[in-house]
Amino acid sequence: MRVFRSDSPEGPFTDGKGTPAVYSSYQLNYGNNSATNRGMKLMGAYGSWGAMTTGERAQGHNSAYVDDNGNAFVVYHTKFDNGTYGHQVRVHQLFVNSEGWLVAAPFRFTGLQTTTTQVATQRIYTADKLVGTYKVLIHPYKQNCAYNDNVSASYSKANEQKPHTVTLNADGTISGDMTGKWALTQEGTSYITLSLNGREYNGVTIRQNMDYYADVPAVCITAVSQTGVPAWLYKEETSTGIQSVRVDHNTTDGKIYNLLGQVVDSHYQGVVIVNGKKVLRR
């Protein structure tokens, strides 16, 4: 899914590099054999993100929706890396960064936790609240996510992006698997800039529940480079103090277990294990 914009409904529509959306001749524009990288990406094939156990890819057939309060959403279908052509519908909230480009929330929409107005008029997280260790996911161009390259690529793990770990330090530096700098910009807003391995991103900070967890809020950052490459970051907003959990039986069935290994219902409060991951339910 790509984004172009224009000052006029009649165009011309261009991306951040000034490349037009209109082609003068046929050019393959997806997959690892693509001849052009035009358009600002919203997302690509990815896996192991948050609590997801099945990777998602080949997102498309999308529609945009804006509610009466100006909150925007992208509705699309996604395929999976499980060896089938089955698909499901997903909804991600959209935000606008300081450069006027759309960026997609890192997780599926499960209820309004951050509004478009809040991003533009409030500092949802102060700098000290943003300091910490994050998972980061980059969505590059030329991912092998469509069947022009290989019949199985539409539903395989080919070129699926996996998260790295970085730390946003109090001195404005970024360390870990990727390095760079970060800074909040425009006082009274939730705009942020990041530099990751030499690439500059403009984005927003938002609060959002992690996928597959109904009540686990995360500190999230969604951003895009001027060349159209998106970056997602998140860290859990709450911590249980448990660093790791050993599970001797399969817990990828969606059932909820307490720390004694007993199955509990969705109303159970406290530390539980869901799909092999710890969750604090309140």
Feature locations, PLM:
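A glycine-anchored, Pro-Gly-centered beta-turn/N-cap motif
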Residues: L130-T133, Y268-V272
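Carbohydrate-active catalytic/glycan-binding domains of CAZyme proteins
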Residues: M1-T238
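C-terminal tail/sorting-segment detector
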Residues: V271-R282
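Residue-level detector of functionally pivotal "anchor" positions at catalytic/ligand-binding pockets or at interdomain
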Residues: E237-L260
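Structural motif
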Residues: S175, L196, L259, V274-N275
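C-terminal trimerization/auto-chaperone modules of long, extracellular attachment fibers and adhesins
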Residues: Q262-V264
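Short, acidic/polar N-cap/turn motifs at the starts of alpha helices
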Residues: H61, V91, D253-G254, Q269-V271
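Surface-exposed, short loops/turns at beta-strand junctions within beta-sandwich domains
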Residues: Y213, S266-Y268
